[in-house]
Structure formats: C-alpha cells, structure tokens
Amino acid sequence: MESLRSLSNISALHELLCRYSNLSGTLTWNLSSTNGTHNLTTANWPPWNLNCTPILDRKKPSPSDLNLWVRIVMYSVIFLLSVFGNTLIIIVLVMNKRLRTITNSFLLSLALSDLMVAVLCMPFTLIPNLMENFIFGEVICRAAAYFMGLSVSVSTFNLVAISIERYSAICNPLKSRVWQTRSHAYRVIAATWVLSSIIMIPYLVYNKTVTFPMKDRRVGHQCRLVWPSKQVQQAWYVLLLTILFFIPGVVMIVAYGLISRELYRGIQFEMDLNKEAKAHKNGVSTPTTIPSGDEGDGCYIQVTKRRNTMEMSTLTPSVCTKMDRARINNSEAKLMAKKRVIRMLIVIVAMFFICWMPIFVANTWKAFDELSAFNTLTGAPISFIHLLSYTSACVNPLIYCFMNKRFRKAFLGTFSSCIKPCRNFRDTDEDIAATGASLSKFSYTTVSSLGPA
C-alpha cells in the first residue's frame, strides 16, 4: 500500500516538473513584449532528464486549427483596417490645405502613432505567439519593444491633448484664442513625442532575447523584459498604469463631461428659441433664455423679449411664416447635432477604457502575482486582450475623422478628382471641432461642428 502511494506521489511530481519545463513560449505578457515567459523557466530547467512526451501528449493538447485561424483572421482584419484607415487620414490631412487646423494637427499625430501601433506591434505579437518562438533577433527585440511602447504612449497623449483642446475651444473660447495657435499645437505634439521617447527608454535597456528548450528539443527564443529586481518591475507597471491609463482617463472624462454639460445648456437654449418662435406666431411675448454677458461662468439669465410690432408690421404674413419656419428648422438641426456630439463623446471615453483597461490591468496583475495571472490568462485570453488594445488603432480614425462630414467630403475630393462637387465643398453646420471652428457659448451654431454627420 505504501509503495503504491509512493509511486503515485512520484508520478504527480513527475507530471508537475514536466509541465513547468514546458511553460516557455506560450504567452505574450508585456505591453511591449513580444513573447513573454514565466520566471520559473530557465534555459537549464529542469536540471535532470525527464521523459515528458507521454504526459505532454495527454495533458497539454495543441490549440485547435479553428482557434488558430480565428486569431489569424482577427489580427489580419484589425491590422488591415488600421493601416488603411490611418494612411488615408494622413494623406487627406497632408494634401488638403483647408483641413490644416489646430485639432487636425493632433489628429495627424494620432494617425501616425496609430499606424505605428499597427505596423510595429501587431506582427511582432502575433507571429511569435503562433510560432512559440521569437525569430527576429536581439536588435529587433529591443527596437520593436521600444517603438511599441513609444507608439502607444504618443497615441494616448494625443487623445488627451485633443480632449483639452476641445474643452478650451468650447468652454473657454475667448481665453483659448490667445494660445490656441498652430505653432503652439506643433510644440505640444513635439513634446508628446519627446516625452514618450524618454519614458520608454527602459524597453531599450531591459528588453532581451532569452533562450528556452522547446518541445522538439530545439532551442527557442523569447523577447522579454528582464528586470534587475521584482520591485523595479512592479514600479514600472504601476507607472505605466498611472501615466498612460489612469491620468489620461480622468482628464478625458472631466474634459468631455464639461463639454457635454455646455452642449446640454446649448440644447436648452435652442429649445427656448423654438418655443419663442412658435409663440411669436400667435403674437405672444415669451421669456427667452440667452447667455449672460459673463463669458467666464457660462450662466444664463431670463430676459423678457418683446417684438417691435411696428417693425414686424412691415413684413407680410407669408414672409414672416417662411422666416419662422426656416428658423425653427435650423434650430432643430442644431439641436440634433448637439445630441449626436454628446453621444460621440460618450463613445470616445467608453472606447478608451474598453480598449486599454484590460491590458494595463493584466500587466499590473502579472507584476504582482505572476503565477496566478499566468494560470488565468494563458492562451486565448491574453491574445484577446492584446487584440482589444490594438483595436483602438482602427477605431480612432472612425470616431475622430470618418464620422466628420467635412472630412468625408475632403476624402472624396482628394481621391475622386473626376467628381467636381466633391472637390468644391463648403462648410456646413455639422462640421467637427477638428475643422478648427471657433466655438463659443454665444454662437451655438458652431458647437455642432464637434459631432459626426
């Protein structure tokens, strides 16, 4: 009986050691890593020979062909959409002089960083995961990791800059005109690239290729971060979580929240104008909500406004009716545009958290409890988390540019030279704030330029 227990314990230990000896090359962890591994695995592990083939065949089957092809197709679709969308944005913004505005300068920088995310992150994440081996060498390992982190950082900082610029243009239009110039925008963009380049230097220093024994007795390679201590690793991921997710997320929530509040006030203003216009048909004097003379606080006061009957008597009833109808229709169009803007702002904030929160949480979890995170996220979960973060590179062009009517017209004017109406387009009331419109509480007609068409 004792001998049977001993054999059972030996068998369990044998299986455990065989599992740990083959953990390498199965998981991508770091935001900029391309083929991570668990700390328990070393090049000489285990220090004695084990015949693990039967156990591996029985306990650790290879991924199904369906799972493999699903991952390839999803990565390919996101990659193509990101490259195609961001390339089109760069071409349109560079070739069209009418779109060279302050906010569009940030959008151009955002498109460049998103294009880098697609080109530098996705291939060097997918290929090593499929092959379970990093085949590109030490130089590519360091360079790819560095530019991955750089592109993600620049993209995040650009989103923050866009939210601050839009907030200033809408909520503090007079003050923002003093400093909102293209030269100032260029300096901010340059600062985001320089700051991101400095922040991501640890990827150049600590990213290395590490060898490990593969299942077919070949020597494999992983591109991974090798930290001098556990404390340094934890501090690094907490830093990334703070400056690339937590602070940008809070800034975007506050900025777009204040913009939504200002637009809601504009909606109330337009509704009061509609009521006043309809009441005027019956010759009734109604209180009209108008902005106060104080540009700083955004308050509104009630002012009783009576039409001059002598002035109105010079107009025929048919002319008055047409003017009132046009005024009401125009006001309702502005009202709908503002509501679309608010919905779009909610989508922007939601997509930022949906795309980036999982990867930052996974990286921080891995830094503090690597074994637990490894067991939970191995395989499909971590692949999906990385894919979700890369989705932002193809979502940003849709939200910030292709939902803008003026940009769509500029796109057609750039690539459809045979269609004259597309080349000679005019501005509309539904242009986005990226068109550089001067937004003011006193002129709610331009606020609708923030939203999609």
Curated annotation (Swiss-Prot):
Transmembrane segments: 65-94, 105-131, 143-164, 185-205, 238-261, 344-364, 380-403
Cystine crosslinks: 141-223
Protein keywords: Cell membrane, Disulfide bond, G-protein coupled receptor, Glycoprotein, Lipoprotein, Membrane, Palmitate, Receptor, Transducer, Transmembrane, Transmembrane helix
GO BP: any one term: neuropeptide signaling pathway
Source domain of life: Eukaryota
Positions in the Cytoplasmic compartment: 95-104, 165-184, 262-343, 404-453
Stretches assigned to the Extracellular side: 1-64, 132-142, 206-237, 365-379
Lipidation sites (S-palmitoyl cysteine): 401
Gene3D superfamilies, per database record: Rhodopsin 7-helix transmembrane proteins
PROSITE patterns (alphabetical): G_PROTEIN_RECEP_F1_1, G_PROTEIN_RECEP_F1_2
Localization in the cell: Cell membrane
Chief place where the protein resides: membrane
GO molecular function terms attached to this record: neuropeptide receptor activity
Glycan-bearing residues: 9, 22, 30, 35, 39
Membrane topology annotation: Multi-pass membrane protein
Keyword Cytoplasm annotated: no
InterPro entries noted in UniProt: Cholcskin_rcpt, GPCR_Rhodpsn, GPCR_Rhodpsn_7TM
A Gene Ontology cellular-component term: plasma membrane
Keyword Nucleotide-binding: no
Tissue localization of expression: Brain and stomach.
Function: Receptor for cholecystokinin. This receptor mediates its action by association with G proteins that activate a phosphatidylinositol-calcium second messenger system. Has high affinity for CCK-8 and low affinities for gastrin-17-I, CCK-4, and unsulfated CCK-8.
Family: Belongs to the G-protein coupled receptor 1 family.
Name used for this protein in its record: Cholecystokinin receptor
UniProt organism field: Xenopus laevis (African clawed frog)
Gene expressing this chain: cckar
